[in-house]
Swiss-Prot record:
It holds the Pfam family DUF402. It catalyses: a ribonucleoside 5'-triphosphate + H2O = a ribonucleoside 5'-diphosphate + phosphate + H(+); a ribonucleoside 5'-diphosphate + H2O = a ribonucleoside 5'-phosphate + phosphate + H(+). It is an enzyme of class 3 (hydrolase). GO terms for molecular function: magnesium ion binding; nucleoside diphosphate phosphatase activity; ribonucleoside triphosphate phosphatase activity. This is Nucleoside triphosphate/diphosphate phosphatase.
């Protein structure tokens, strides 16, 4: 159903493998939109959890989604540099309402010096069993975790120097 237009404000919805809604980011401004890649930005946007609790993001963030990668990347601009939060997830879909993806629990937190921690491995194992992830999905997710780590080491895509700053400058044009 097409792609969001640059400058448009949309929501981001994450789901779990069982189809249940996990989290909604209320407002993200689209900065780039093609069939392969969507880049968006938000700042102090409301996030709604599956249980109805809400919270507001603390800093500007650049969100990177790719149609052929089983991960998405959020670059957060903080005083000490860019921090990244990476979700191992399905490739994105856009249905005219929101960017949507399945969150597969494994996350990678990347610090400004490009060191990283892999998070939520226990949660992944629990959900893999309780939601019966097929072996094919398990293999794909592990493969793309390695691809993501390679991108981090190579400073590729959203990890490239100046990537987040460049897109943040573009985002500021929409907020004036």
């Amino acid at each position: 159903m097409g792609y969001p237009k640059e400058g448009e404000t949309i929501q981001i919805h994450s789901y779990k493998h069982n189809g249940l809604l996990h989290r909604i980011w209320n407002e993200t401004t689209i900065l780039k939109s093609t069939e392969l890649c969507i880049i968006g930005a938000n700042d102090r946007t409301m996030v709604t959890e599956s249980d109805g609790r809400t919270w507001v993001t603390r800093e500007p963030a650049i969100c990177y989604f790719h149609a052929r990668q089983w991960f998405n990347v959020i670059g957060m601009l903080r005083d000490d540099g860019v921090h990244y939060y990476c979700n191992i997830s399905s490739p994105f879909a856009y249905d005219g309402e929101a960017i949507k993806y399945i969150d597969y629990d494994l996350d990678v937190k990347v610090f400004p010096d490009m060191t990283y921690n892999i998070l939520d491995e226990d949660e992944y194992d629990d959900h893999r069993k309780s939601m019966n992830y097929p072996k094919e999905i398990d293999s794909i997710l592990k493969e793309y975790l390695n691809t993501l780590l390679h991108w981090i080491h190579q400073r590729k895509g959203p990890f490239a120097p100046e990537f987040v700053d460049m897109w943040y400058e573009r985002y500021l044009r929409y907020t004036k």
